[in-house]
Design a protein with these regions (language model features):
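N-terminal transmembrane hairpin
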Residues: 1-126, 207-294
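Structured inter-helical modules in multipass membrane proteins
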Residues: 108-217
């Protein structure tokens, strides 16, 4: 049984959570909401992946810095010019906007990392396999492609090194080895897609309604979570409609305050994102109490 309590919830609950977390995470550019999203995504990612997840979380920090620093080179708009480079102004507003865009990218990568661990292919097919079988199969293949691609790439590089290939230290040797690996991985991905499609077609996939590999039943706890999430999403959407998440960067920085009535929207957003983490610690505390009574 999965140790993460949220992973044991009904797939509809899990899909609604990630739909809200990723959907609002993409469109909201307010720094406070972005920071809350990063904390929640990183925390849940570490709970799912254990100590090994720190490597992935830290790996995104150089990406964040690089995207932040590069944005003003392509977007010189803004009032506060920090310095000029190549005859173009390097503005503070563009730097701040680059940080927000980079933050959104990193947060989305973390949420998708959590999604791939929680929403397995059988859960997704259970939800949408009978409604849109072709689209469901395509989305499952896409979501599985990235982690499988990196895993297969590491295996291929390790296999090549074990036979003495790809160990050159020169620039030309490294480029040649990289192109060889890329060519092999491209062929592997295309071949895998064709084989999967042919295999599913030969099994009659999509020709009629199908049963799920695993039976997922809606419990009272699932219904309670659905009601809570819908209520929190309604509060967040209402705050966004009233302008409580407004953020302007050009020509000058301007953010909606997290105070007054807008504070309730921010609290609802944080509560929504922390649902899986709260469930995890709630179960851990419950088991700790039970074990202490033995």
């Amino acid at each position: 049984m999965d140790r993460d309590p949220f992973s044991r919830c009904h797939p509809a609950v899990q899909f609604l959570f990630f739909l809200g977390a990723i959907g609002f995470g993409v469109v909201i550019q307010h720094p406070a909401y972005l920071l809350a999203g990063w904390v929640a995504a990183a925390g849940y990612y570490l709970l799912l992946h254990g100590p090994g997840g720190w490597r992935q979380v830290i790996m995104w920090l150089p990406v964040f810095v690089a995207l932040t620093v590069l944005n003003p080179l392509f977007n010189p708009r803004g009032e506060h010019v920090l310095f000029t480079i190549f005859g173009r102004p390097y503005t503070g507003e563009a730097l701040a906007y680059g940080g927000v865009i980079a933050g959104v990218f990193v947060v989305m990568m973390l949420w998708f990392g959590c999604y791939n661990r929680v929403m397995t292919s059988d859960k997704f097919m259970c939800l949408f396999g009978n409604w849109a079988p072709s689209l469901s199969l395509l989305l499952v293949m896409v979501f599985r492609l990235v982690p499988r691609f990196f895993r297969q790439t590491r295996q291929l590089i390790g296999a090549r090194r074990s036979v003495g290939k790809g160990t050159g230290k020169g620039y030309r040797d490294k480029v040649a080895a990289g192109m060889t690996v890329l060519s092999a991985m491209t062929s592997w991905a295309l071949e895998g897609s064709v084989i999967t499609a042919a295999s599913m077609r030969s099994r009659g996939y999509g020709s009629a309604r199908r049963s799920c590999f695993q039976v997922f039943r809606v419990t009272a706890g699932d219904r309670l979570l659905l009601v809570m999430m819908l209520a929190l999403l309604a509060a967040v959407l209402g705050t966004a409609t009233l302008g409580g998440m407004a953020a302007d960067f050009i020509p000058q920085l301007s953010f909606a305050p997290i105070s007054g009535g807008y504070a309730w929207g921010f609290l609802a957003y944080c509560s929504y994102l922390l649902i899986p983490t709260v469930l995890h610690f709630r179960e851990a505390l419950h088991w700790h109490i039970l074990r202490s009574r033995i």
